[in-house]
Amino acid sequence: MPQLIDVATAEAPYTIAQDDAAAFARAQFGNAVPHLERLMPLFTNTGIRQRRIAKPASWYQTAHGLDEKNIAYIEAATDMCADAARTLLARRGLAPTDVDRIYYVNTTGLATPSIDARLINVLGLKRTARRTPIWGLGCAGGVAGLATAARDLIGHPRERALVFAAEMCSLTFLADDFSKSNLVATALFADGAAVALVSGDDTGDVGWPIRTTRSMLFPDSLDVMGWSVVARGLQVVFDQRIPEIIAEHAAAELDALLTAAGISRNDITEFLYHPGGPKVLQAYADAYGISTDRFRWSRDVFRDYGNMSSVTVLYVLARYLQAHRPGHGGHAVVSALGPGFSSEGLLLGL
């Protein structure tokens, strides 16, 4: 079966402490949002210490058109993905021409030609590499990208795939949107990029086998999360039902994933999840009947980087893989939720 070999990350160039983000929100929302101070504790309740963003904080104080923001996305995503790929290929002793497939995941910017085409030129990847851009899966995109690569490589065991994800959530900020959803996004979201190497059975690469994958689109949930496309750009959509959906569906989804691999919850060593936020991790813990400490890798990445949408779970995997060697036994569940409303999951052999 295909294996996850390595994950490398690239950080956005600017750091913003959570206290500074809260001060920014007070200045930006203060005159337009009644009873703003009642909502401000959400900045501390997230547990986030700092985040990385693509532009200096002062840039976000004024409105920018979709064209300007999208150009900034393309530039940042291309540069950061290239940096992450160079790190990964050097660490694994691989040449760019050793890569046969390229997957590019994002939801926060638009590009035609797609970013993967730009990366072939920047990195010197094969011009015959098969390219698969994946857009619109939001926070679930990182897991979906890994799962798609793994399924494709089942029939191509001698091939290697790079799965890129790059999200510049901060660039979607609308300075004149004073909704609660935009305030919540200001407290949670950040920017980052990552790349994973997934290899077929016959490459000789040694990593963590991807044993099975699962996708689920929940009924009557299209309005739970996503974008509203407005003249000024992408306007964030959130619904308070997310913890309720987790409570209703998460346990059954976990059991279905495990059953496909012939194992049970007792066989799970690690939960490597997209953190989303504290309420999301708590809802998972309640649904599974476990402590939130089981999500420590996710919680720590969220503390240090915030929610980078599809990229976040790859940061979680990068930390875990750098601290462990393959083959010590056990299983890790990797999962994320995204627009649709949907769930993506995969099972790693450890």
Feature map (PLM): residue ranges:
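Claisen-condensing/thiolase-fold acyl-transfer catalytic domains that form or cleave C-C bonds
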Residues: 82, 108-109, 118-121, 126-128, ...
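Conserved beta-ketoacyl condensing-enzyme motif
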Residues: 46-127, 131-136, 265-281
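Condensing-enzyme catalytic core mediating Claisen C-C bond formation in acyl metabolism
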Residues: 1-75, 175-248, 252, 337, ...
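Short coil/turn connectors at secondary-structure junctions
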Residues: 1-2, 96-100, 127-130, 155-161, ...
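Short, well-ordered amphipathic alpha-helical segments that serve as non-catalytic structural scaffolds
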Residues: 44, 76-91, 115, 193, ...
